[in-house]
Amino acid sequence: MATLPRAAPPTPAALLPLPRAAPPLLLAGRAAAARRSRLRARGPSAAARRSWVVASAASSSSRAVVGGVARREAPPAPQKPTQQAADLNHILSERGACGVGFVANLKNMSSFDIVRDALMALGCMEHRGGCGADSDSGDGAGLMSAVPWDLFDDWASKQGLALFDRRNTGVGMVFLPQDEKSMEEAKAATEKVFVDEGLEVLGWRPVPFNVSVVGRNAKETMPNIQQIFVKVAKEDNADDIERELYISRKLIERAAKSFSWADELYFCSLSSRTIVYKGMLRSEVLGQFYLDLQNELYKSPFAIYHRRFSTNTSPRWPLAQPMRLLGHNGEINTIQGNLNWMRSRETTLKSPVWRGREHEICPFGDPKASDSANLDSTAELLLRSGRSPAEALMILVPEAYKNHPTLSIKYPEVTDFYDYYKGQMEAWDGPALLLFSDGRTVGATLDRNGLRPARYWRTSDDFVYVASEVGVIPMDESKVVMKGRLGPGMMITVDLQTGQVLENTEVKKTVASASPYGTWLQECTRLIKPVNFLSSTIMDNETVLRHQQAFGYSSEDVQMVIESMASQGKEPTFCMGDDIPLAVLSQRPHLLYDYFKQRFAQVTNPAIDPLREGLVMSLEVNIGKRGNILEVGPENADQVALSSPVLNEGELETLLNDSKLKPKVLSTYFDIRKGLDGSLDKTIQALCEEADAAVRSGSQLLVLSDRSEAPEPTRPAIPILLAVGAIHQHLIQNGLRMSASIVADTAQCFSTHHFACLIGYGASAVCPYLALETCRQWRLSNKTLNLMRNGKMPTVTIEQAQRNFIKAVKSGLLKILSKMGISLLSSYCGAQIFEIYGLGQEVVDLAFCGSVSKIGGLTLDELGRETLSFWVKAFSEDTAKRLENFGFIQSRPGGEYHANNPEMSKLLHKAIREKRDNAYTVYQQHLASRPVNVLRDLLELKSDRAPIPIGKVESATSIVERFCTGGMSLGAISRETHEAIAIAMNRIGGKSNSGEGGEDPIRWNPLTDVVDGYSPTLPHLKGLQNGDTATSAIKQVASGRFGVTPTFLVNADQIEIKIAQGAKPGEGGQLPGKKVSAYIARLRNSKPGVPLISPPPHHDIYSIEDLAQLIYDLHQINPKAKVSVKLVSEAGIGTVASGVSKANADIIQISGHDGGTGASPISSIKHAGGPWELGLTETNQTLIQNGLRERVVLRVDGGFRSGQDVLIAAAMGADEYGFGSVAMIATGCVMARICHTNNCPVGVASQREELRARFPGVPGDLVNYFLFVAEEVRAALAQLGYEKLDDIIGRTDLLKPKHISLVKTQHIDLGYLLSNAGLPEWSSSQIRSQDVHTNGPVLDETILADPEIADAIENEKEVSKAFQIYNVDRAVCGRVAGVIAKKYGDTGFAGQLNITFNGSAGQSFGCFLTPGMNIRLVGEANDYVGKGMAGGELVVVPVDKTGFVPEDATIVGNTCLYGATGGQVFVRGKAGERFAVRNSLCQAVVEGTGDHCCEYMTGGCVVVLGKAGRNVAAGMTGGLAYILDEDDTLVPKVNKEIVKMQRVNAPAGQMQLKGLIEAYVEKTGSEKGIAILREWEAYLPLFWQLVPPSEEDSPEACAEFERVLAKQATTQLSAK
């Protein structure tokens, strides 16, 4: 065997430059400028300030760069994570996103140019990647290509070796251990497996590299990189050769497990066709690091490239991409369930191609690897088992085919394919752009929601390109014959053997036609048709009551949940947040479900809107045995298909009567006659054994039932969630899970959260028999009948009541799935997407294995006792004749303790209004003596010092500067409340938060007209002072973008991006029309009375790199404002926060689950989000361990009421502290808890003028409160012996457990909260005082530096200029708009800037434009064009000479005009998904759009002169849309929930449409527009007008507008 000595690192001059003439020069200049700016920024502020710079370009300046002075000269290397930091599920520790693409030659001609182009494209997407704390270690970059045989033959010949047999030789790209001895052991072990397999090892080749370009952190973990060549002589078939190499690799991985270096051995690739070069590198240095990639003998017909942005900064070389088959941009949300199900399949997978060796290729997943690595592993298994890459990905990542009229009508075989595999393989669900190649085919596919950008183009010289962005490779546009984009669920493939390019349906039809899937489904799959509900009760009232008591129902559960759902058909809504103790801290018994909190999407993947985007979601589920996924046949279709997992009694009976399922009913009761201790455990073990035996005997359906005609006092029911989870886990561990489905037939399930838990832990369906009986009982009660008879309640039949209940449950399930960004119930089933608070490891290991439970808690015996405490109530002699009210939802005497209670409110009001220290002391004592309510109540401060005089402690005025108020929107609360809070915070130097909804510009200037506490400027307030300002220092950017204008942003000290809200994380919001007064409508650029919808996700944040882009945009328009990102506490938040820090945020806010809300479903308030104590601890520790803590201020909020809360939060690492509900109480809130009704009795949360007039608050009250809190902090610091709050921040060693003994806290472990990862290098004050993070050199600076442009802005003149633009130039014109908005406001600029750009614009082109800015782009643009624009004109046209037809080409990306409040946009060509999403007042014309056009639109006008995608106008409550429908296909694509479709009949509408097209033609020269105007009379009838209710009476929409207007005038006169 021959080896080649490792090459010495070459000199920089020897490195091959990327061949792009203009951009590198431009970028180099910016990089130099960035370095100069860093040098100028050294030294924290005047005293201690540091500036973090992230440059805009794909160059060395594109990474975070650190400069400055800290407590020591050189920052330390990141510490390796401790065991405590790793106390999370491995899955949560690796999240990310990226930029990807491929280049392919249709003639299969290999060339070095392809590799060079791929490297160039990779370099131009550096901004989509991330770097570690050293700002130099890339999160990962890589390239996959064909094996470069010419290069390897050249090497072999130089070594005196024979040339390789290219057909039969495999090449392994191997990461080996660093240690020399371990490396030799690994090589020997590898060779042994190959030899044992009958393969010939030809030799090892050390891969030549240049280590000087590797970052410091990446260098520490850099492997020894070598290639191994093996000959597979025993196989002739090419697929068999690949399969033999796959088996060998699996055997090597298995053999390595017995060695200490097992985790250090990794095959990037092992194939005769493809090879992967990757590492923890930045894009631009991949080609400099691997010297092979500079060698012109490296030739390939294709190349896939990938740049990673990981939220985790600990370098892990193997997780760089591409993987062995895939390059993945996105995140798999269902990964835990996918891994569980793949583990379950290991015993069932069989295929002749494996020749009986299936057991040797297990396991099929690795929880320690990333989601991308596991998806790649599964796809590779299918590929090596005989599937094509396209087929494998159709199985794993199916499109949303159910609501796709084109597929169902034109390609029924494709829908049959998806229906067949729906029952075999749960979808790997989540945002995903997947590029793939097996060496013969290269392609790309997009997830069902289309959540990642994917543009493609084809040239006349036979090249195909796919990339996350356009403009990454210089292109002669005259050669481009096709420009398109992948829409949701779409696929494109290039067959390198035949040169065919297959687009979407062509690919899928070919795959789906291979087998008669439709015939198999018709013959084998049974569909359960809906069965009628029972029409009478089956229990008497006393029996119902006994069951309800035994199974833990309260009167609130029945009246506020079940009955409300039965009556209304939707989940009940409540407000003010969850202020009762966690279940484990409560002194009252709780159902097992209450120990579980739903997880939710934030930052790394988006939530989904289940109401407006329901076409991508499904609750369908199949029952029965899941077959062998590696084989295709009719037996796999032998299942029962359910349309929903919620069954009534008749539907359950149908399942039980299905003989093919061989159903087995298992009773879930345990016997306590021999004592309680151990009985629950023994019964569950026996239950698992019974289930095991039943499945081995052929049962395909296990029904776990607690149904009993006569419950017995000594045989309580096992909590059904515990039974389901235990059997689910047992069957997985014993290889039986695929053989049977689990159905729960239970009394203990009535809320949507209960259903979600059961399904999440393994149940396929649930029959809630007692809840349904409760619905029937309610409907037949005299009270209900009387209410219906008197018109005080909607009239429903007994069947409708049950149907309404199930409808509400199904809607609630969709919402819970959508919070996590999951579309399919089949993917949610068994995915365990919950966090546990209060269950011990014994319980978790038994039934909920893999779920995160950080604080421990109840044992099985304790859980049994809690279960029994409900059960005995039903059988005691003094059993109540009605259900008990536990007070879990509403505060009531004798009920559960609520932190926001009337007594607390009265004591606080007394203290702050009287401004007496002793009154505040009484308030403090009340809080100190309350029952344990939150985790921090279990902790107290201790000191390692003697007390000091309070006079030595920093002042209260200094402390209050760290205080903030929560983001409460003007609209949810009244103007009076909003302004009073802002004035108070400005007086003390703290910060108020605008919340969503904007702000009146009148508030941005200090008051100078105050007399006797009143001001004509703000006449509705009292207690004012001259010098007061009502501006909110923190201005919020939420998903609805309401009120977000350029002027709003430039008047912010800080800008908060609200990702999630503690009381309802993962959900959007809706301001009801009754709260949208004329004033609110003006601020939100809407009409009075129009409901205003905020989407669940930000539609420009689907991943971590998207968040980085929005932060970049905001820094662009206001470079002086710090950008904050608000997250909600959950397991894994530390990893997310690391990504947020790397995304260049200045501040991270952690919110607890107990924060307030104006309105939210009860299940969300109660069951989503976690305590901030855990989230803050994890975030602080993770940031410290990753070397990122100094970059960001940590702010925390959620239930803060006192100085004690501040002190504990400080010790846990927080720099700043947020107060929400208590601030409202201080300004007058009386906790009526009816915020969502608009009937607040004191006008705090109402827009009704007569109620607002009752507002009692004055700013001074809130000032007094915060000063009291600060003095409390001072007194505590003095007692602790510390002079500054700085000195205790992060000092968890100053915390200790209180000596409190509660019934359920005996086994709680607070070790995680008390653990310490060390302190940051800087003090909190230094971190808080550092400069705003910047974008580095940007094109806007060049524009603003132009003397003519500067003069035009300063003196309101007209100027025309032109600039070249590249994809690395992002948010172009945002900085210019900010300068104009700061000087003139949103509408005051009278000058005119006419700027033309030539080239490919980066993301957010033309964002935040103001009137007077006329921007023209000749070329193409990426995502977010016109984001937040308030005026001006934005035109995008292709270059003059193109090889494609402009109206057929995608010319701009996704999510254009997001939140636009004015201006005009004209695009000659097509746009991507979500064009004009949340458009307020912008007018736009485009020649075609993707899905979700005009979503959530509230104003403006959009004209589409071509095809639109699906789900048009979903959530559209204002504005008008005109869409040309030449082929009569639009009607089924429109979401008609709100809008109506009509032809353009109104003369004003015709004029508006024609006028916009005329302007469009003038600006773009569109041939399509010219043709329409030329034949206007023929085209006009082909247009549809989409009209929401708010526009029905407008002159443009109402053909009889004049008559309607006259009628309204007559009515008004009559009224007078």
Swiss-Prot record:
InterPro entries (UniProt xref): Aldolase_TIM, ET-N_metabolism_enzyme, GATase_2_dom, Glu_synth_asu_C, Glu_synth_asu_C_sf, Glu_synth_centr_N, Glu_synthdom, Ntn_hydrolases_N
UniProt-recorded Gene Ontology molecular function terms: 3 iron, 4 sulfur cluster binding; glutamate synthase (ferredoxin) activity; glutamate synthase activity; metal ion binding
Catalytic residues identified in the record: C98 (for gatase activity)
Assigned EC number: 1.4.7.1
Residues annotated to bind [3Fe-4S] cluster: C1229, C1235, C1240
Glycoprotein found in the keyword field: no
Pathway noted in the entry: Amino-acid biosynthesis; L-glutamate biosynthesis via GLT pathway; L-glutamate from 2-oxoglutarate and L-glutamine (ferredoxin route): step 1/1; Energy metabolism; nitrogen metabolism
GO cellular component, one term: chloroplast stroma
Keyword line: 3Fe-4S, Amino-acid biosynthesis, Chloroplast, FAD, Flavoprotein, FMN, Glutamate biosynthesis, Glutamine amidotransferase, Iron, Iron-sulfur, Metal-binding, Oxidoreductase, Plastid, Transit peptide
Transit peptide start and end: 1-97
Statement: the UniProt record of this protein carries the keyword Oxidoreductase: yes
UniProt remark on cofactor binding: Binds 1 [3Fe-4S] cluster.
Residues the entry annotates as binding FMN: 1176-1233
Expressed in which tissues: Mostly in green tissues and lesser in non-photosynthetic tissues.
Residues annotated as domain Glutamine amidotransferase type-2: 98-497
GO-annotated biological processes: ammonia assimilation cycle; glutamate biosynthetic process; L-glutamate biosynthetic process
Class of the enzyme per the UniProt entry, highest EC level: oxidoreductase
Known cofactor(s): [3Fe-4S] cluster; FAD; FMN
Location of the protein in the cell: Plastid, Chloroplast stroma
Taxonomy, superkingdom: Eukaryota
Swiss-Prot/TrEMBL catalytic activity: 2 oxidized [2Fe-2S]-[ferredoxin] + 2 L-glutamate = L-glutamine + 2 reduced [2Fe-2S]-[ferredoxin] + 2-oxoglutarate + 2 H(+)
Assembly and interaction partners: Monomer.
Assigned protein family: Belongs to the glutamate synthase family.
Protein name: Ferredoxin-dependent glutamate synthase, chloroplastic
Organism for this UniProt entry: Zea mays (Maize)
